[in-house]
């Protein structure tokens, strides 16, 4: 599997252009430390119409951080591609934490699916962004394809579970 994943990452390295490099660095930076997504969730919390969406995002991010970043990364301790092949010139700083699952992809899909479950149009735009964010992590040679796949699946599942729990709580409050 690692050979196939490296082959794909090396193919992505062959696509580099100055414009695409800048775009991927910028897109990836929006996922750094979850700041963009935290800000978006807080903004959504400010308005009654989007408050539930913002709360779902925050709960999903918290759960994802605990499961993905604190538990799974340290359980699997998967080396990053840039650690295994340091000959590839990186456009970003070498990450210090483990690779699996991708935290950027995890938070991107948690938030995108949280929005999509409540607003299909806005959610579709956020899903497109989440896919770009996931792609940027492979393009930048800091994640394997299975890292971003796991982040996308886990983030989507977490968002769906949080959404279902919030709906169930809301139903019980109305009884």
Please place each PLM-identified region on the residue numbering.
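Membrane-embedded catalytic cores of phosphoryl/pyrophosphoryl-handling enzymes
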Residues: 89-175
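Interfacial segments of alpha-helical transmembrane regions
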Residues: 40-66
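Membrane-water interface at transmembrane helix exits
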Residues: 44, 68, 72-77, 116, ...
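N-terminal transmembrane-helix/juxtamembrane module of multi-pass inner/ER membrane proteins
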Residues: 1-35, 69-97, 173-175
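Membrane-helix interface segments
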Residues: 19-20, 34, 49-54, 118-125
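Small-polar-interrupted transmembrane alpha-helices in polytopic inner-membrane proteins
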Residues: 59-73, 124-137
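Hydrophobic, aromatic-rich transmembrane alpha-helices
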Residues: 37-48, 108-114
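Alpha-helical transmembrane segments in multi-pass membrane proteins
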Residues: 56, 60-65, 69, 151, ...
